[in-house]
Amino acid sequence: KKALVECDGDMDKAVEWLREKGLAKAAKKAGRIAAEGMSYALTENGVGVVVEVNCETDFCAKSDLFVAFVKDIAKVIAEQNPADVDALMNCKYVGSELTVSETMPEKVMSIGENLQIRRFVRFAENTSVGYVHAGGKIGVLVNLAVEGGIDATEIGKNVAMQIAALNPRFWDKSQVTDEVLAEEKKIALALMDTDPKMASKPDAVKEKIVMGKMNKF
């Protein structure tokens, strides 16, 4: 009603007036910090996606509107294969001729908080298995190369759960750099020096203990 009054009863102008007001409000929300959100994993038609989308509050992160938005973004990534978040913003939104970027202001208004698509990973080869922990606080996507038609779903799920629990920095020892090993060794020696039982031990003994720890790292 207010829009019609402002536009002298012109319906088309009223719609445009409302749209402009909505975009202005969305722009104001865009400056607010989006530190909450959720991760979502999607696997379909041989493609695996995990995406993180942020909002402002935990309450919003659990809302049906926000969850539906995150799922739509995952579907866009799976179907249109954008290279990065910038490219994703130029993709067509699900069931629309508008791009993700053009759709964002309306989503910000309907959901009521600033929204940010933080990051994503997409695999289109081998077998992808997704796992989401703690209601979307942690999202993992594992991509496995299998032979002989083996169903790797259960293995992939177990690996994904381990990753969610332990947050490993590397897949195997070959990926661990000398710099990382040197830093871990330095930390281990420093911790030993703070332990009265270990601090008095000879350096050679400390070195041997640390090397044992490094083999387990």
For each predicted feature, which ranges?
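N-terminal assembly/interaction segments in proteins that build large macromolecular machines
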Residues: K1-F217
